[in-house]
Amino acid sequence: MTEGRRCQVHLLDDRKLELLVQPKLLAKELLDLVASHFNLKEKEYFGIAFTDETGHLNWLQLDRRVLEHDFPKKSGPVVLYFCVRFYIESISYLKDNATIELFFLNAKSCIYKELIDVDSEVVFELASYILQEAKGDFSSNEVVRSDLKKLPALPTQALKEHPSLAYCEDRVIEYYKKLNGQTRGQAIVNYMSIVESLPTYGVHYYAVKDKQGIPWWLGLSYKGIFQYDYHDKVKPRKIFQWRQLENLYFREKKFSVEVHDPRRASVTRRTFGHSGIAVHTWYACPALIKSIWAMAISQHQFYLDRKQSKSKIHAARSLSEIAIDLTETGTLKTSKLANMGSKGKIISGSSGSLLSSGSQESDSSQSAKKDMLAALKSRQEALEETLRQRLEELKRLCLREAELTGKLPVEYPLDPGEEPPIVRRRIGTAFKLDEQKILPKGEEAELERLEREFAIQSQITEAARRLASDPNVSKKLKKQRKTSYLNALKKLQEIENAINENRIKSGKKPTQRASLVIDDGNIASEDSSLSDALVLEDEDSQVTSTISPLQSPHKGLPPRPPSSHNRPPPPQSLEGLRQLHYHRTDYDKSPLKPKMWSESSLDEPYEKVKKRSSHGHSSSHKRFPSTGSCTEAGVSSSLQNSPIRSLPHWNSQSSMPSTPDLRVRSPHYVHSTRSVDISPTRLHSLALHFRHRSSSLESQGKLLGSENDTGSPDFYTPRTRSSNGSDPMDDCSSCTSHSSSEHYYPAQMNANYSTLAEDSPSKARQRQRQRQRAAGALGSASSGSMPNLAARSGAASTGGGVYLHSQSQPSSQYRIKEYPLYIEGSATPVVVRSLESDQEGHYSVKAQFKTSNSYTAGGLFKESWRGGGDEGDAGRLTPSRSQILRTPSLGRDGAHDKGSGRAAVSDELRQWYQRSTASHKEHSRLSHTSSTSSDSGSQYSTSSQSTFVAHSRVTRMPQMCKATSAALPQSQRSSTPSSEIGATPPSSPHHILTWQTGEATENSPIMDGSESPTHQSTDE
């Protein structure tokens, strides 16, 4: 079956569509393809059927694949029929004329195939309307008799009831003569009016038997289910309207319906089941029973949809309007796709999986086409009006020119056959221009070309001059560059000489721009040699000094690397080149001595700005006394201390980077390294290098971003030292169980480089004592992660409900389908599910919530949440027998109240999120205070302590954010700002303990404090 199967679809206009159906093609897609051949919009009334082995029509289920249906086991292509599946009261409710035409063709086909029982006299009258629609008015008896043999007008049963064919033809001719003057549309409308009045119209008949084996006809329509005598399809014996039915189900050879009968009284109190419910059962082969069940469900859904949409249905059109429209449109229009592929009565379709060409055309409505045509017509009129105005303006301009010159221009617009107007020249318009004052066009273009060449050559000369003045090159290369510079000057002088010649010819003064460039080049070469000597002296003084973040008013403004976004644009003129040359002295050399490489003078504009004052050295040394560590940091090269240089060391031969351990028995101070201004892309790559694992609470490395006074970036990294197992910080290693740590960089913060110092031993011991006092609140596995939502046993239970999905899955042979059920007084439909397999199935007609063990409304009954009290039994959803669904089961918790399971989980999540948000707000306030109070040594140590504690805990924040966003409800997640989700954890040790355990602390001033209005609104 992988190569597909050939199918032949019989259309209502006697055409046949042949196509190769692919295995994955759905029945809905096949219906779209067939409908596209009629440009059909209202496809909901139609379906595709096939004749099964019992001789009954079996309809394709639109949500299943075509080849999954049980087709007859015959050779050759599968025969399918496109016809009407759902009927309505009148064609006046149909919107499109094509739909009315197809209903007419379907009615003719059903009567001719004897699917509808019709009296013989009615058949003769209907045949006359068919002749009037196809052939027009009556002409002669012979023509009518020949037409009746060609048209499908007289069914076989009507011919059998009468002695001869001539009698039947005479009766048709009598009716046909009375229809003279009727249009085609009127004939169709009158035909459908008669057919719609028939009691058997719109009913699908199925042959069944009852328990005694008596044969019956079971009729299904949009009105309900009817039971007919086997020899009489007109008058039903039993009528079951859809509003009376409760449930529909089948099992193998049995089809049953539960009918609500209010007149039926209960016999005794011991009666099982409902007293007002009567069950009716019919029997047939399993394939036919399943087909009846599927048709009953589809008819009930169509009944509900029409009942729900009656208020939205537009006013029905009158039959006279429909007749006029049908007459004007003519015969049924087929699509271009059908005409292209048709050969006589057979349409050769392509692969059934290619549906886009037809479905797009069928989806466009007639009203949309009319609107498009109206818009195009209005656009055409606007363009024609604009063209007329432009032509009038052109005529006026041409006439004015003709009055001045005495000759009508050739651009004057003339209509076909129109003679050009005669225009007289005005008096006094003749004059003569001075030819000497007009510059020839060739000389003007030559001067412009020379000016462009001079601008380009001046930039080339300036670049050659800068290369020639570079002192860090060899003598040979310097000589070559000097020669190139002299040649560029010579060419520049030649271009200027040519420009001056042209300027003298045009009466302008000559220029001397090339000589100025030569003089500037000589002065610049002398200045560059002097500035290089000054830079070398300045390098010696800078390398031996220890630099702090407060030395420069720029607070460590880094030398900008020659990147694309920091490089200044090239000068566009000679003045820009001269200004750039004069500004070169504002930059200073890098403090690094060139060792393996040397900087050229071309890099000078990208180096850091000269220091404006040197008094920052003494102030910084007073504020931070020099120690051994300071001296070591100052003497070593700043580039080697930079985190960029040390990255390969961190990622050396191991997937787990080294853990920075912090000593607490030596004084610690802040040392600055050489800052590097990096782009956001480079910052993200650095963040990947800084990811590492840690087993100690205090040694969690984190890149903290903070804003300093001038807005310059500072990047904080912990200094790595040898670890000591006896450090007090290591005692908290049992409180954490992180396998990895993520780093978060807020978008509004600038990440900066600087070395983060450790705390003093007294501060560490103080924090250790605080942790020991709050050790009872610490859990072995909580440590800042999501709160545990599992139910707690014993006295520690908080009453939070637990949603545990059971692992029971519906069997693979069952198919669960959902249908919308509209309940009286409800605006939104209730989802009703039907359970279907090859052997049995169930469908609820009314979605009533019951608690009985019988077949209920699609399994949609429920029991309320019950509290187990002291026994510890929790409420449980009782599954229905009618369906197999995954239902939530509750944990065994005795502290529940009724209906408190979902509320407890939501309340616990809400409290945890509010605690973390409040802690973040207090931490932001403390961080801001500590960052602004850095003028004294004591204040700076306080800031370092708070920042360090926050630094050791902040690595867990991204995991908290991910868990929070996953656990919160969708409405609360959508209304939570991203800045609050990605917040930094609290900075004080007390808040860290609260953060780790996820429990509220009674004496915390923040837990009693502000609760964000946004979160309050979302919680409610």
UniProtKB/Swiss-Prot annotation:
Specify residue ranges for compositional bias: Low complexity.
351-367, 773-796, 927-947
InterPro entries reported for this sequence: Band_41_domain, CUPID, FERM/acyl-CoA-bd_prot_sf, FERM_2, FERM_central, FERM_CS, FERM_domain, FERM_N
Bias (Basic residues): 609-624
Q: Which residues form the FERM domain?
A: 5-307
GO molecular function, a single term = protein-macromolecule adaptor activity
The Basic and acidic residues compositionally biased stretches are 893-910
Q: Where is the composition biased (Pro residues)?
A: 556-572
* Region annotation (Necessary for tight junction and adherens junction localization) ranges: 565-920
Where, subcellularly, is it found? Cytoplasm, Cytoskeleton; Cell junction, Adherens junction; Cell junction, Tight junction
Extent of Polar residues compositional bias: 542-551, 626-658, 967-981, 994-1004, 1011-1020
Spell out the SMART domains in the cross-references: B41, FERM_C
At the top level, the lineage of the source is Eukaryota
Q: Can you name this protein?
A: FERM domain-containing protein 4A
